[in-house]
Curated annotation (Swiss-Prot):
Pathway: Amine and polyamine biosynthesis; spermidine biosynthesis; spermidine from putrescine: step 1/1
Record key words, sorted: Cytoplasm, Polyamine biosynthesis, Spermidine biosynthesis, Transferase
PROSITE patterns associated with the record: PABS_1, PABS_2
Protein's recorded name: Polyamine aminopropyltransferase
Length: 288
């Protein structure tokens, strides 16, 4: 796993010998933050590549295939998303998409690793201007908190219309973000009508983790939906889970608000295709 200088390539190896790789021109930056090893590469055809502990987080060319699909389905399904919490997402891409919605009055991003925010600001062109305003506390609709998202959610008195978890994969340290206890904290901090969304890993390679998270969410939320999308740089299709609190229909989105968004990957036509999981995965999920 990692950078092969002789081959000028970065390869992330998934379970069962499956790999995703990029040809790279050079390594731009590497450091050991308080929490993880962080690397940034310049690829040959996909812009810059952000890697945490050997796992691909994003490539600049195509990052919208993840951020748009994580954010806009829940934002457009909610009737009036005014307060939004983002846990993780230190590169700024998720919050950038949240703030496209003019209904949003306040968004809070809680990122545990300040090093990710700083490196993303210095080296990536994903949300540089937004991160600059957040760091300087000059973004009127959003706030950056450097801290533990699990602890923040448990202790905050804030209530949210939408909670978005943009974390690393549902293995290792991030497993707490996929626990029943965490889901209960999230449910409690949602308003009467609320939506929760999280990425849930590779459909094919993290199937067991997807099933575990889905099962735990079903114990907590009023309804739970699953969907998938091909994400550039990941072992796609990539899965997402949505938890519903109250009277919100995630299968229906606000078409008028959707028309105002000039997006690259996601649109109302795409929304209808999100739920097309492979048959064997549907059978496994529906058996939970």
């Amino acid at each position: 796993m990692g950078y092969n200088e002789q081959e000028r390539a970065f390869i992330e190896w998934y379970p069962r010998g499956y790999g995703v790789g990029f040809k790279v021109k050079r390594r731009l930056f590497e450091t050991q933050t308080e929490y993880q090893r962080l690397e940034i590469y310049e690829t040959e055809g996909f812009g810059k590549l952000l890697v945490l502990d050997g796992t691909v987080q994003l490539v600049e060319v195509g990052e919208e295939s993840y951020h748009e699909v994580l954010v806009h389905p829940v934002m457009l399904a909610h009737p009036n998303p005014r307060k939004v919490l983002v846990i993780g997402g230190g590169d700024g891409g998720t919050l950038r998409e949240v703030l496209r919605h003019d209904t949003v009055e306040k968004a809070i991003m809680v990122e545990i690793d300040e090093g990710v925010v700083e490196a993303s600001y210095l080296y990536l062109d994903v949300a540089k201007d937004l991160l600059d305003r957040l760091i300087k506390k000059e973004e009127p609709r959003a706030e950056l908190i450097i801290g533990d998202g699990v602890k923040y959610l448990r202790e905050t008195d804030e209530r949210f219309d939408v909670i978005i978890v943009d974390s690393t994969d549902p293995v290792g340290p991030a497993k707490l973000l996929f626990s029943e206890e965490f889901y209960r904290d999230a449910y409690e901090k949602l308003n009467e009508k609320g939506l929760y969304v999280t990425q849930a890993g590779s459909v094919y390679l993290f199937t067991n983790e997807l099933l575990d998270a889905y099962k735990a969410m079903k114990k907590v939320f009023d309804r739970v939906y699953y969907f998938s999308f091909p994400v550039i740089g990941y072992a796609s299709p990539w899965s997402f889970l949505v938890g519903v609190k109250g009277d919100v229909d995630f299968t229906r989105i606000d078409l008028e608000r959707a028309k105002k968004l000039d997006l690259y990957y996601y649109d109302p036509e795409r929304h209808e295709t999100l739920f097309q999981m492979p048959r064997y995965v549907r059978k496994l999920l529906e058996g939970q």
